[in-house]
Amino acid sequence: MERLHESLHEAPIIDKDGYEYLVHPISNGVPVLEPGLLREVVIDIMQQSDFNVDKIVAPEAMGIHLATALSLQTDVPLVVIRKRSYGLPGEVALHKSTGYSESEMYINDIEAGDRILIIDDLLSTGGTLAAICGALDDIGTEIIDIVVVIRKIGQSAMDELEHDVTSLVDITVEDGEVTIQ
């Protein structure tokens, strides 16, 4: 995880209304995402995750590149939870609230009984993942594994759920500095 650790120490931190926001290639697509970093992250996820699932699920937008690479390597179909409604039969809307925004997301092509692996870039406030897990639980799926690349240590909406989250690296961001735990 040498590349990931290096990139975290080099990542800019910006203030978003009092929230220290990490700007990182994995979680934001800027600065540029080098193939070596993406490869390192995908290999590590593959070594730690359970791929005995029916579908890999990733929220738009920054989970897509990770889930795509994993789908290509494992031949497990990919479902993207979108920020836009398509009005398709069976579409499920969910409301997410994070430390810096609120919005709706939409789930398609997920059915009761599906075994799911959720992949995302960053767990910070947990609002996105908690909303997704709640909706997938309501649908009747079996969430087999939840993997994030970066977990920002602190209170998270995921703490209130019965789902464990695996992270490749845990960090704190304080006074504009990233510390790897």
UniProtKB/Swiss-Prot annotation:
GO terms for molecular function: transferase activity. The keyword Transferase applies. Its EC number is 2.4.2.-. Keywords: Purine salvage, Transferase. One of its GO terms (biological process) is purine ribonucleoside salvage. It is an enzyme of class 2 (transferase). The keyword Oxidoreductase does not apply. InterPro entries: HGPRTase-like, PRibTrfase_dom, PRTase-like, Pur/Pyrimidine_PRTase. Pfam families: Pribosyltran. NCBIfam families: HPT_Archaea, PRK02304.1-4. PANTHER family: HYPOXANTHINE/GUANINE PHOSPHORIBOSYLTRANSFERASE, XANTHINE PHOSPHORIBOSYLTRANSFERASE. Belongs to the purine/pyrimidine phosphoribosyltransferase family. Archaeal HPRT subfamily. May catalyze a purine salvage reaction, the substrate is unknown. This is HGPRTase-like protein 2. The lineage of its organism: Archaea, Methanobacteriati, Methanobacteriota, Stenosarchaea group, Halobacteria.
